[in-house]
Amino acid sequence: MSSPWKTSQSSVPMPEMIVKIVGSKHFRYFIEKPMNKQNEKLKTEPQTSLQKPRNDYSRRVSRDLPGPTDSSEQQITANPAEKEESKHQRSSLKPESNQKFLTRVFSNRFLDGRISYEANVHCSSVPTGDQSLSYMHSLPRRKSVGWCLEHTAKDSSGQAEEIVQRPSVMTREDSFLTTLVRRELNSRPLSSNLLDKLQKELKTLDPISSGFLHQSQLSCLFLRHKVPLPLLTVKLLCQRFSRRCSPEMVNYGEVLCFLKEATKDNLQQNGTAGYSNSRKTSSPSYHKQSIPPQDSSLLSEVNKSLLEILKMALRPCQGKLSIDCLNMSFRKEDHSFSGCLPLPKVISICSKHGLYVTMTLLETLLHHQELGYRGEIKWKNFVKWLNRASADLSCDMPAGKNKKETQGDLVDIPERPQRKTEHVKTPEENLQTKNPTTMTSAPEDPVTFFKNRPVSQPVEHLAVKKDGQSELWIDRFRKLENALYLCDLSNTGVLERERARRLIHNYNLIYSLSLSPRRINQALQRYRSGENIILEPALQYLKEL
């Protein structure tokens, strides 16, 4: 580094204090531009350091200095009598001490007068990447926020106090500070052990038990104990509980009480939230006991509607769906082991096992708290609810021939023509038609069988049509929805318009949906997108008869 001493004829001494932070160390040194002749006199004759060219500057400096504690650091005044006394005292000092005094005097002009006291400069090492300069602790002048808080406290109390205490009515600044501290302590609340350690060390740092500490001491203590508060929040706390006459001194007892209250509020909120969550996640056997009667009735209604929806989806594949195999497929597809799967994945897995669910059905299930999570389906709970719906569906089926038919379906799955003839007979027996001869002659006379069949309807769907008359209309319409969604292989929710028209007309005849051609054309025209049709609104329009 080049020598800082540069002599010039018109140079005025302007000492500057430079602080450099290198790694974990900080270096402090002074740079001064002395006058050409008076600098030599400064080293040899201490009394000439305060000659006339520098009287105005030193007088201006003395206004900013606090009262000295040492006799060698008396204030510089313009009174001649006091000036001679000060000269007499300074003449007895060594040149080194006088140079130190001058260095302290002129260090008050550090950083162009931004910091007015030498004791204010307090440096710490800065972590890597921290560009906020928040680790350089200094005592700034009172800002508008501090003065606003002080005047608010003064007006509410009606008397001048030594400390800016919290008013009885919480002000806007107090509520903001409370909210800020609670939010920052929400993730990492302060433990009671840490608060006790802080209180002991604060009392150690205050040997005279004045109740006040320097702001930099409090900040360094918080940093050493890793208190999870940013330095900006610590600074706001120090401003809030600072002394009125000296803003750099902070009432640490008030700060600790404030932190204890914020931590207590956070613990209470987290405790109530955890208690409510534990009640929600309790076992199903005790779930009804932990809810009030009104909530239990509402929950039972929701569960009943959910079971009805799942039973409606299970009816077409009753006896063919293996829920254990479905569970294994879900487990294989859950690569992240999160217990959740997206809706298109759930649709594709269910369709592989013969369970046809629509996007609308899954979106309805998302609103249930046990099945939906962030737009995905909790497949484990979904399988549990399918088990319950399947058990209820098997209990709802009447005893007798229907049970035998379901057992025959489970055993004799390859014999599809025989199963279909049985389904032809069952509705006829239940309806008890007047002429049973036609029922027995229908399979025996193939000529009349084909004559009575419409041209647009294939042979294999006659049984389905007769059986469909005993089903609900919404169940038959659900089959139309499943067929259209299965044709959408890419799960885009869009199908080719002409293909959708053919499918809707065909399934309208097969399942006797009684949809008018005019309404079908209106749905296709209203919800078309270019050459395609959007399935969900079109099907909803057809459903609203």
UniProtKB/Swiss-Prot annotation:
Domain of life, per lineage: Eukaryota
UniProt biased composition (Basic and acidic residues): 34-44, 53-63, 415-428
Disulfide pattern: none
Region span, Disordered: 34-98, 269-296, 415-444
Extent of Polar residues compositional bias: 69-78, 429-441
Protein name per the record: Uncharacterized protein C1orf87 homolog
Organism: Mus musculus
Lineage: Eukaryota, Metazoa, Chordata, Craniata, Vertebrata
